[in-house]
């Protein structure tokens, strides 16, 4: 992949941007959307350059979270498995629903067939808000680029259905850039989307 056109690799159209091994001196931060399975080599790379990191990979395990937490003592680390702020507004809404009184709760997610983790990190995050184990999440992979998460609560005589859809994955890139503007001069610490969203909404 090194020295290949990033546009040619991802979109089959050259864009003048080349994959390089080294960062330029004026790099402000690193945004990482790559596969989380290479975490050890990534951490070695992050330590070498000591730049703030927005870590957008999904599917990291507890050990990976501990490694990133330790890394945040050396440089600012922002963990954002989903860079859409509306997902975190949705999570707050789910917490406000009295899930314990529901007779049945279901969570489903649909992503492009190239997505590796099943279920997605976002689906697991949403399931955690209502106490659903990840093996109960319904997973669908399709040829569509849409990302869809659905949550259904069934009560005695009522049903609540919530759906969040992303129709174009550029939403994630735009979200990452908004985070970058807020984050790149922050002090060494571990950051999450909740803090970012609360500050945007004027909460401390």
List where the protein language model places each region.
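C-terminal substrate-binding/catalytic lobe of Rossmann-fold NAD(P)-dependent oxidoreductases
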Residues: 1-27, 101-204
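Short glycine/serine/threonine/alanine-rich loop segments
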Residues: 51, 75, 132
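Structural motif
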Residues: 33, 57-58, 193-194
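Rossmann-like NAD(P)-binding element
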Residues: 22-41, 51-52
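Anion (oxyanion) recognition and catalysis
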Residues: 47
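Rossmann-fold NAD(P)-binding glycine/threonine-rich loop
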Residues: 37-44, 56-79, 84-88, 92-97
């Amino acid at each position: 992949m090194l020295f290949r056109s990033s546009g040619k690799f991802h979109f089959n159209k050259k864009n003048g941007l080349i994959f390089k091994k080294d960062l330029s001196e004026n790099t402000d931060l690193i945004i990482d959307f790559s596969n989380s399975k290479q975490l050890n080599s990534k951490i070695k790379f992050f330590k070498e350059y000591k730049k703030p990191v927005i870590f957008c990979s999904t599917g990291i395990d507890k050990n990976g979270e501990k490694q990133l937490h330790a890394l945040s003592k050396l440089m600012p680390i922002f963990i954002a498995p989903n860079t859409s702020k509306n997902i975190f507004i949705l999570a707050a809404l789910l917490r406000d629903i009295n899930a314990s009184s529901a007779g049945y709760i279901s969570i489903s997610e649909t992503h492009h067939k190239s997505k590796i983790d099943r279920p997605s990190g976002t689906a697991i995050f949403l399931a955690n808000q209502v106490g659903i184990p990840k093996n109960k999440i319904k997973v669908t992979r399709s040829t569509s680029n849409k990302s869809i998460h659905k949550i259904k609560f069934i009560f005695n005589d009522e049903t609540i259905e919530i759906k969040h859809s992303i129709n174009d994955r550029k939403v994630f890139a735009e979200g990452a850039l908004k985070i970058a503007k807020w984050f790149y001069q922050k002090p060494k610490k571990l950051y999450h989307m909740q803090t970012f969203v609360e500050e945007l909404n004027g909460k401390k």
